């Protein structure tokens, strides 16, 4: 499936000094987001920083959401991840996409201007209306069993 979404450059370095966000390969599910920085930024272990990407999008369709996710290589090799697990870009948000990076590694890491820091993918959304009830209309075998209640193997 392919859709067109309007994108706006909000940092003049994007597209000149810093490559435009794009899919790395034909089979990539997500667009790489790059750090729009004036200079290298050192992250110490345990530190979090909000990093601008220079990009804004107009998803427009409430049936789509932008999802900002960690890059596996940065997480595995350096302990850098999107701080809140994922970032959600709502269809009506038009501001610059920022990435909150958390550093879980043991050594300082320096982010360079233009470095790929996260990935942006687009997913369908189903909005629901919650019907508040005192008891559910159906029961399940699991019931209210929480973590670990579905088995170990």
From Swiss-Prot:
Enzyme Commission number(s) from the entry: 3.6.1.23
Coiled coil segments of this chain: none
Binding site residues for substrate: 71-73, 84, 88-90
Cofactor(s), names only, from the UniProt record: Mg(2+)
GO molecular function: dUTP diphosphatase activity; magnesium ion binding
Record carries keyword Plastid: no
GO biological process: dUMP biosynthetic process; dUTP catabolic process
Protein keywords: Hydrolase, Magnesium, Metal-binding, Nucleotide metabolism
Metabolic or biological pathway: Pyrimidine metabolism; dUMP biosynthesis; dUMP from dCTP (dUTP route): step 2/2
Residues annotated as signal peptide: none
Catalytic activity reported: dUTP + H2O = dUMP + diphosphate + H(+)
Membership in a protein family: Belongs to the dUTPase family.
HAMAP family given in the database record: dUTPase_bact
Protein's recorded name: Deoxyuridine 5'-triphosphate nucleotidohydrolase
Organism: Halorhodospira halophila (strain DSM 244 / SL1) (Ectothiorhodospira halophila (strain DSM 244 / SL1))
């Amino acid at each position: 499936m392919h859709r067109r979404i309007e994108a706006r450059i909000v940092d003049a370095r994007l597209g000149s000094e810093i490559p435009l966000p794009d899919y790395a390969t034909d089979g990539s599910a997500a667009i790489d987001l790059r750090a729009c920085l004036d200079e290298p930024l050192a992250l110490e272990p345990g530190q979090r920083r909000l990093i601008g990407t220079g990009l804004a999008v107009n998803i427009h369709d409430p049936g789509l959401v932008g999802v900002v996710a960690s890059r596996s290589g940065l997480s595995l090799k350096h302990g850098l991840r999107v701080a809140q697990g994922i970032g959600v870009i709502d269809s009506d948000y038009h501001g610059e996409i920022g990435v909150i990076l958390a550093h879980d590694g043991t050594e300082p890491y320096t982010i360079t201007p233009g470095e790929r820091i996260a990935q942006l993918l687009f997913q369908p959304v189903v909005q629901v209306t919650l019907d508040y009830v005192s008891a559910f209309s159906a029961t399940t075998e699991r019931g209210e069993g929480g973590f670990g209640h579905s088995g170990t193997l």
